Each structure stands twice: as structure tokens, then as C-alpha cells.
Design a protein with these regions (language model features):
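Metal-dependent nuclease catalytic cores that hydrolyze phosphodiester bonds in DNA/RNA
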Residues: 1-122, 127-164, 180, 194, ...
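Metal-dependent nuclease catalytic regions and adjoining charged, substrate-binding loops involved
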Residues: 10, 15-19, 25, 146-169, ...
């Protein structure tokens, strides 16, 4: 039982049928036009095989999204919609055989954004914020004297009055680079491609930074709007252990109709996802 409708900003709800089928939606109240809502309303079959992206999420979240009826807030889907459009434009510029490759293996499904059979390169597109981009790139900084020669007028955190002002100089530290679950996701796509007899020499994530150019992004060392970062290879044994365990946990919960344990700290982004971003947080017994 996937999502069944939308939430208005005031909190009341309307079903997909009433909103999109019968056109009873108050567009001005919703603040989002029908064409965008139609994209947000697309659903997958609840009895489908687990997908790579689904297994990256917490098992409890995946279980509730399959078994409970819930309404979605279009405002929380804004960046997801932008990401979908971003993917679609890039896919339209790739050949049919290289873009949106559908894969299946060990009863887990996945869709690869781009596989270049000539260069044997796998690309995954991400529309992300500067915070995540800085983590992926391993951005760090050191302080140096302001090249303008400016000095502090008052003593403070960075220096005493009369001493040269300090400015941040950012650099990439490969040892600090952290792709998080992206590395697991993209490596699983690699494994699935290789299972078809094809080779993958390198993997990259191409990040389009949503807040690129803003002060917040520059304060994290993110100066560009698009970055290409190489994804390190994860050993297949570790990869399969992770995904098989997550697959079995979800399927067992669905079969027994038992709500899984609370998603772990990494899956909930330290609890932030439970507070603001999970579609089924209001249905979760652990929140």
C-alpha cells in the first residue's frame, strides 16, 4: 500500500484520484501545479523485488512504505523532483543502450544511470547539497594570511588586534572523502553489470550541487556547480553481505507482517530524517 495522495500545506489531504483523476485539486492552495504532482505520484508495485536504493534506506522505512497508506508532502519532494528532471535530461543525451540500464541480480533490482561500454565507465548522477558534496570530496581547509594585507581591528577567535586577518583555503583530502551509502549503491550497480559479463574499469558520481554559488556552499569549499568524483571499489564479499542481509531482513518482515526494528543512526542521518524527511515518519512506532 504505497502513497495514496497529497498533503496540503495546512495539513489536510487529498487522494491521487481526487487530485489528478477527478481534477478536484485546489492548485493555488497546494502551490504546485498538476504536471509536477503527476510525476511525484508515480508509484511502484508493492510486491516488487527489493531495489538497490530501497535497501540503502532503513528496513523499517522500506517496510512501512510498502505496507501502509500514506500521503506525501509535495514540498518535501521538491529536490527529488529536480533530481528526476536532472536525470531525464542527461539520459536524453545518451544512447539508448548506455542510459538507464535495468539490472537484476540475487533478487535485487537496480537501474544504472549510465554505462559506457567503450570506456567501461559507470556513471551515477546525483543532485545534492553542498554539505554532502563536501563530504564526498573530502574538503578541508587551513588558515593563511589574507592576501589583501588586512588586519584584525579587534582581538578575537582567529587572532589579536593588529595581526593579519586569516582566510580559509580549501583543499581535497582523499583520506577524508566519505561517499557514505553512495559507494555501496554504485558498487552494487557495478557488481550487477559485471554479472552480465561486462567490465567496469571505473565508477564515478557526477554531482550537481543544488546550492552551488551560494555563501553556504563556498563556506564548505564548494566553488563549482558540478563535480565528478571517482567511487572507490568495495570488495564484492562485503558488498553482498550488506545487500543480502538487508534484502532478507525486508522480505522476512513483509512475510511475517512484523514491523522491523528502528532504522539505525546512519540510515536516519542521526535522527534528522525521522524528524523532517521520511515519508512514513508519522506511521513509525519508533518515532
Amino acid at each position: 500500500m504505497p502513497a495514496i495522495g497529497f498533503k496540503y500545506p495546512e495539513g489536510d489531504t487529498i487522494s491521487f484520484q481526487n487530485a489528478l483523476g477527478d481534477r478536484k485539486l485546489d492548485v493555488e492552495r497546494m502551490g504546485v501545479y498538476i504536471t509536477a504532482l503527476e510525476e511525484m505520484a508515480k508509484q511502484r508495485e508493492p510486491d516488487r523485488k527489493p531495489s538497490v536504493t530501497e535497501l540503502i534506506n532503513g528496513t523499517c522505512q522500506a517496510y512501512l512504505q510498502r505496507t501502509e497508506e500514506y500521503y506525501i508532502d509535495p514540498q518535501e519532494y521538491a529536490f527529488s523532483l529536480a533530481g528526476t528532471m536532472h536525470h531525464r535530461i542527461l539520459e536524453n543525451n545518451a544512447s539508448e543502450e548506455e542510459s538507464e540500464v535495468s539490472l537484476e541480480g540475487i533478487d535485487i533490482t537496480g537501474i544504472v544511470d549510465l554505462y559506457d561500454s567503450k570506456s567501461k565507465i559507470l556513471i551515477d548522477y546525483k543532485n545534492t547539497g553542498s554539505y554532502k558534496a563536501s563530504q564526498v570530496l573530502g574538503m578541508e581547509f587551513y588558515l593563511e594570511d589574507d592576501p589583501s594585507g588586512a588586519v584584525y581591528k579587534r582581538s578575537g577567535r582567529w587572532g589579536k588586534a593588529g595581526t593579519p586577518k586569516k582566510v580559509k583555503r580549501y583543499f581535497q583530502n582523499p583520506e577524508k572523502a566519505d561517499m557514505g551509502d553512495w559507494a555501496l549503491q554504485i558498487n552494487m550497480y557495478r557488481f550487477m553489470i559485471e554479472s552480465t559479463g561486462k567490465q567496469v574499469e571505473k565508477m564515478y558520481v557526477q554531482m550537481t550541487v543544488r546550492d552551488g554559488g551560494l555563501v553556504a556552499a563556498r563556506d564548505r569549499g564548494i566553488e563549482r556547480n558540478i563535480y565528478l568524483a571517482e567511487v572507490p571499489k568495495i570488495h564484492n564479499d562485503h558488498l553482498l553481505d550488506f545487500f543480502k542481509e538487508k534484502r532478507d531482513r525486508l522480505l522476512e518482515a513483509l512475510e511475517s507482517k512484523t514491523v522491523p526494528n528502528k532504522c539505525n543512526d546512519k540510515e536516519t542521518w542521526g535522527g534528522i530524517k525521522c524528524q523532517r524527511f521520511c515519508d512514513v515518519r508519522h506511521l513509525c512506532p519508533w518515532v
